[in-house]
Amino acid sequence: IGDTAIISAPDEWVLFKGREDGFQQQVMFANTSDWRFDTPDANHYVQFIDRATRGDIDDDLYNKHLRPIKELSDKWWQGQMQKSKGSLPVSMVKYWGELMGMAGGSVRPPLAGLSQSEKDELARDLRVLRDQIPAVVGDTR
């Protein structure tokens, strides 16, 4: 693997699994993590992926700056997938982006947006995380 086949998966757990199994993922499949997890002042996700795809998996960087936000993302991603019976959680991703300072906009039918209580909960979850790890999450509204 790496000489005749290139692995590209959208989740960083593959990088850790590759280290265990003796292969190195050389590229990262496009995902929403870089713009949901990073800010202009703290681009830890991009730094981690850049290094990991060159074979330098920095456990300390991941555990300190990325694991908490990844766990929050997994909680919301899985919850929204269950709620929508398997649809990608586009409304959650768009609103998360808004909380990170980007324009998200609304989803198109037949998808439904987050309820106000879900928006409030996600904003609160991100705010709590920001307070715990200031360099990870940008200001939330």
Question: Where are these predicted regions, by residue range?
Answer:
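Glycine- and other small-residue-rich loops at beta-strand/loop junctions that grip anionic moieties
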Residues: S8, D34, Q82-K85, L111
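Conserved, mostly hydrophobic/aromatic
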Residues: D60, V93, L122
